[in-house]
């Protein structure tokens, strides 16, 4: 994990279900942060809307979630393309059952606007970061956690847009919970957690 007590700057982007939390951490505290309501739930909604508009098919939230998990991508033309995902549902015009193969390239296109909002928020936090800590972040990179970190190619897309390396945390779905658990076991080291 990250040494949050070190006098160096670490930046974490946690893309959860309802929000994306972006924070610069140093000396056991948050130096600057931002929270935006663009995260996994918005990605799922984007996919639902895309299927309706581009393929004239109605899909529910569970199917959209499965599409996101199976073939969700932040970049088109990934090195390792997942197999297209077969979506079955009613045609919006005829109500007849239809079957459509959806590709990760399509999902990358459909998530583009939401991912651009996350990029803008990361850049805003970087602008607010003190120069010394900014340099640490450039050298160490930015750490991605949360379920959204599992979107294929997200680290590469963010690197291409922001020009700082991004690293997906080990077990990103549980990284924040594990870190919180460790901190709560050591409340004497982190008294600010009890305020």
Predicted regions and their residues:
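Residue-level signature of catalytic and energy-coupling elements of molecular machines
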Residues: 14, 47, 122, 144, ...
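Glycine-rich phosphate-binding loops at beta-strand->alpha-helix junctions
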Residues: 134-158
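Acidic, glycine/GT-rich loop-and beta-edge segments that sit at the periphery of enzyme/chaperone cores
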Residues: 60, 64, 79, 182-195
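Conserved phosphate-binding/catalytic loops in two-lobed NTP-binding clefts
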Residues: 156-181, 190-195
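Phosphate-binding glycine-rich/basic clefts of nucleotide- and phosphate-handling proteins
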Residues: 27-112
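Gly/Thr-rich phosphate-binding beta-strand-loop-beta motif of the actin/hexokinase/Hsp70
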Residues: 4-32, 79, 152
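Phosphate/ATP-binding catalytic cores across multiple sugar-kinase/actin-like superfamilies
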Residues: 110-138, 183-187
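Conserved phosphate-binding catalytic cores of ATP/NTP-utilizing and phosphoryl-transfer enzymes
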Residues: 1-13, 181-185, 189
């Amino acid at each position: 994990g990250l040494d949050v007590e070190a006098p160096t700057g670490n930046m974490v982007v946690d893309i959860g279900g309802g929000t994306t939390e972006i924070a610069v951490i140093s000396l056991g505290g948050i130096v600057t942060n931002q929270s935006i309501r663009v995260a996994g739930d918005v990605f799922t909604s984007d996919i639902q809307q895309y299927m309706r508009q581009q393929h004239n098919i109605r899909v529910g939230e569970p199917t959209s979630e499965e599409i996101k998990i199976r073939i969700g991508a932040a970049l088109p033309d990934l090195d390792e393309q997942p197999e297209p995902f077969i979506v079955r549902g009613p045609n919006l015009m005829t109500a007849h059952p239809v079957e459509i193969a959806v590709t990760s390239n399509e999902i990358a296109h459909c998530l583009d606007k939401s991912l651009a909002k996350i990029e803008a928020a990361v850049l805003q936090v970087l602008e607010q970061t003190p120069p010394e800590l900014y340099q640490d972040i450039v050298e160490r990179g930015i750490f991605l956690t949360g379920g959204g970190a599992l979107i294929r190619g997200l680290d590469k897309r963010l690197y291409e847009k922001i020009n700082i390396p991004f690293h997906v945390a080990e077990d990103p779905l549980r990284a924040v919970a594990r870190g919180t658990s460790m901190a709560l076991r050591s409340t004497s080291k982190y008294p600010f957690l009890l305020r």
